Amino acid sequence: MSLAYGIIAIISLSMVGICVLADKKRDEWLIWLFVSVAVCNLGYFMLSVSKELDAALNSNRIAYLGSVFLPFFLLMMVQRFCKIKSNKKITTLLILLGVVMLGITTSPGILPIYYKTVDIEFAGGATKLVREYGPLHMLYYVYLGLYMLSMVGMTLFAIAKKKVTSHLHTFLLLSAVLCNIVIWLVEQFLPRGFEWLSVSYILTECLILMLYRSMQRQGLMFNKPRPSSYTIDVLMVIFLLLFANCVRIITKGTTPTMYVISHIVVLIIYIGILVSWGMSVYDRIVHKSIRRYLVILMGLMMFWMLMRTL
């Protein structure tokens, strides 16, 4: 089962790269949606290979870092697709609400408010948390439920007001909204041996990207001035660097397998940042010889990163 989580995590990280390459306009909510899915699925994988309770709890915190803000980013994208004007005060309030919820969901091992008790067990080739829910655990269900109702309500409102006129766009939007809801509801009533939401997140990404690209080609996106791509790129780099070092710190002193995996993840992130920067600079260079030197320099830097990691 750990192998399945590992494959899903790699696919999620790859989807972030696909999103950056596919979205030349750098839509901030779209990028953060893909990043949150990658963070969540990476947390699931790290949890599945954890050997100690502390490592499992830290991995669970990484998973919640992605899953807590994922509904918010998805709601922002649905709002864009439905051509509903955003309200800065409501957006700020939702971000603050997410921060509070993140504090609650990452409290296990510190406070008994989300889980009263928590331990780990090894079953099916993976590590799982054995927990007794605390008094504030129900708040997370309420949090998710409100987001789900908001997304469904926005979608139905947009269809009724003919803000979404294409049958294909309607189908993709409804599928993206309902996909996670259906999987989440099924998981509540069936024995959960596997986090099927990790798979549904990737399906949702594919649907969102298909819808986004289709609407973009038809000129239905970016009715408002779009943010600076440079600013988004800088924020993405800062986030990825912080995330990479967070993974390295959390896995420090754990099992050899986790040590190797964490370094591979960090290496992928560093190389991704380097390649993105190189491509950006390469496009701005006219002289062929300077381009050649840039490619050689990037190759040497990637080789150095690989040797340093090994």
Positions of predicted regions on the chain:
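Interfacial "cap-and-anchor" motif at the non-cytosolic start of specific transmembrane alpha-helices
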Residues: S2, S12, L42, V164-Y270, ...
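Membrane-embedded alpha-helical segments of multi-pass membrane proteins
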Residues: Y5-L13, I62-L70, Y143-M148, V199-L207, ...
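Extracellular-loop-to-transmembrane junctions of the mid-late helices
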Residues: M1-I10, G103-F157, W184-S200, R308-L310
